[in-house]
Amino acid sequence: MKLSELKTGESGVIVKVSGHGGFRKRVIEMGFIKGKKVDVLLNAPLQDPVKYKIMGYEVSLRHSEADHIEVVSIDEAKHDAELSKADAEDRQQVMNSQIVDTNDNDELALGDKMLVAEKKDNASNEAIAEQEAERLHHVINVALVGNPNCGKTSLFNFASGAHERVGNYSGVTVDAKVGEADFNGYHFNLVDLPGTYSLSAYSPEELYVRKQLIEHTPDIVINVIDTSNLERNLYLTTQLIDMHIRMVCALNMFDETEKRGDNIDYDKLGELFGISMIPTVFTNGRGVDKLFETIIELYEGKEDTNAHYRHIHINHGHEIEHGIEHIQKYLKVDDSIRQRYSTRYLSIKLLENDKHAEEYVSHLKSAKEIFAARDEAAKRVKEETLEDSETAIMDAKYGFIHGALQEAGYEPGKAKDTYQITHLIDRILTNKYVGFPIFILLLFI
């Protein structure tokens, strides 16, 4: 349940805090961390904000902020424990009724069991809630995001045991596919989102993925990358970084790049992007264990001790960065924005003249000031780069990617194309002279 659902006088134990980068960090710094007890002290006359007590001091949160904090109600945990105890006692009575010949040892054993049960009954309600919170904390919500045909569905199938079709065709991954997996004591809820080249909301797939990431923020995103086309795939990675969400990259089809002889220091590339990049081959499971181990490390907050787990800002150049900062000043005035979006991400989208971002901002009280700041920033970018702001941002992202690949020593291999046979078949089947006769022939086979 959410912290906002607790009523005055009730208590709970925190399971996890969701939400985007800056907002999530601020809430955690206020003391709302896993395993801590929180008491609801007082609701304001208009029911907002709500005063809480945590770690010995009082703090107020809006309901919209408390919606991002998952808790276990101490009263509910006690109730569930009592139901479990009642079920256990019923089972014991059934077992006892089946015993015909008993003796003192049996009675003693039963007495010992009752004594153990009594000791368990004396456990505090808070301890019960803490145990339940710990159990729920071991549930990780993961979203799979990547370009079409990058191997997302193959990972989904391998990890969850599902049998989704692979391929970017109508009817395949048109909406989110949900599955489950267990690894090293953690339970993973997996969501396979539609393949998309960007988060620009020009297509239904792009809009759907973006909406899911914003409205149903996952604990971790697995950005699946087709390693045979790094530059194109990493463009989506830069946009996910803008959203300030925790992420791990799976460098999929890594065996194909090895066969081709590609050279890349993926460890260095990960440092430059601030993300762990794990070589994988989902068709045979190579790298999957390492991928899920890395997800657990990131989820448990070990990023501070690892250079790969650091949030970076893609440098778009002086004038664009100045424009982003200028817009952010006006966005940060409204706290409700920070609960839903990274203000940097929203600033970039406004500079790109994104219609959905504009629609969201148009309903804010400060909409006029925000749009004025955006227009001023876009004008400066145009004067500086001689390009509209959307094109300038795209060029800057590809410039960052190109520089990172160079620094990571990326060189394409000289071996023959591993898809040479596939490409040859494609050329034959799409030939205007022989393709149609082959199609007719196949219809009659």
Where are these regions (language model features)?
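Helical mechanochemical/support elements of P-loop NTPase systems and associated helical scaffolds
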Residues: 23, 170-174, 186-189, 201, ...
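Conserved C-terminal guanine-recognition region of P-loop GTPase G domains, centered on the G4
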Residues: 181-184, 208-277
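Canonical P-loop GTPase G-domain recognition
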Residues: 257-312
